[in-house]
Amino acid sequence: MGKITKFVKSKVCNSTNRAFPLIVNHHTMASFQIQIISETLIKPSSPTPPSLKQHQLSDYDKTMHHMYTPVAFLYTSHGHGIPSTDEVSQLLKNSLSKTLKHYSHFAGRLVGDSHVDCNDMGVKLLEVRVRCPMAEVLKRPNTDAQDLVYPKGLPWSMAKEDILVVAQISYFDCGGIAVSADISHKIVDVASITTFMNDWAAMARNSSYKPSPQIVSPTILKMDDVPATAEDDNMKENICQSRRFLFHDSKIAELKALAVNSGAENPTRVELVTAILHKCAVTASTAALGSFMPNILLLAVNLRSIISPPLAKTSIGNMSSCYAISATHENRMKFPLLAGELRRSKIKLFQKYGKQLNESELLFLNSTDKAHESQKLSDGDNFDCFIFSSLCRSPFYEVDFGWGRPVLVYVPNCPFKNTFFLIDTPTQDGIEALVTLEENVMQIFENDEGLLAFASLIKDS
């Protein structure tokens, strides 16, 4: 049995004996209730040995915000034979406990910006009963879903406590289940989250499974001068709106033909979608402001396979960086040009750094390049920064706890302006883009005919 500490008695409430809060959420098309069943601390299945009691953050980890990075996995009961609520609860708690034995710092507590105290205090796990069928969530991903499958207000928030991981199991009336995780960016990037969730799921399917995460050594990523973690303009409070857009593979193929015919060298599907989104976002921003503003585009890239020698795919820690393109004149904001520049920037990064430099040199110089690019723009007029992250080709849809693959991997709306998240569609036949822009910019962006020629707006039904 895994180690479980309960600070709220786990007991399903009925209408005559409500021992737990009942949250009522009203929507124009439906009403639903969220009933908290339990809030639990899950500890590693065996104590962390003294030699591993302190996990030092790498210099790159230290530059990251202690912000909860969210992802949720939704499973329907149709044809999968999901066990009873009690069975699921014990299965997920015990498998999480066993998995944490191999991820001891996930169950520890952050100490300043220097290290994690691997004190086995545990991961917070909430269980909730959702009084509606999961179909209601699948029909309205823009509104209802977030508060049903995540702890309210937690995704993308700056952590107010030292807990590094918060998970939630949501039980729906139809028998469907959602499993979500909010993990501090101080200790993970997207690839790390993928590895952890797949290890947890594999442990649930087979209790004798042995995860083999490779914890990144803090000595790998040394910087001469570690920049302080600071709030950038994109993370300030703004009145923003989020929208989801669907790019079918057939439309991405059309984008590729346009780019290649104009001289771009075999851009990837992510680069193509990034280029058209960036073009249309800048066009909308220009219309809203009344004039063009110089801008920089940052696209995240996983460093594990780039550095020489490459790191294992199961390396845990922040091993992602960005490559950048910038535009100081409006005539550079043409789709084929942007697609070609993205491709060349990535190739330059791979060729210049991947083969010639070791890990620490790659990270330091790449960070220096980004800082120089930003400084070059900010020395003049104000500039806009557009940040893209891709979850495409990541094995999120392989996270199977024993009742099949998820019907949806759900990333909640992001509160930060000019952010874009790309993820494969559940049917693997396209890319879904989650876009967050300032409200006045979004009103123009979502009606851009140049965008809608290749993407469709995902609306709540």
UniProtKB/Swiss-Prot annotation:
Enzyme class (EC, first level): transferase
Record bears the keyword Zinc: no
Secretion signal, residue range per the UniProt entry: none
Keyword field: Acyltransferase, Alkaloid metabolism, Cytoplasm, Transferase
Enzyme Commission numbers on file: 2.3.1.326
Pathway(s) per entry: Alkaloid biosynthesis
Single GO term (MF): acetyltransferase activity
InterPro entries linked to this entry: CAT-like_dom_sf
Subunit structure and binding partners: Monomer.
Similarity remark: Belongs to the plant acyltransferase family.
Protein name in the entry: Diaboline synthase
Gene for this chain: AT
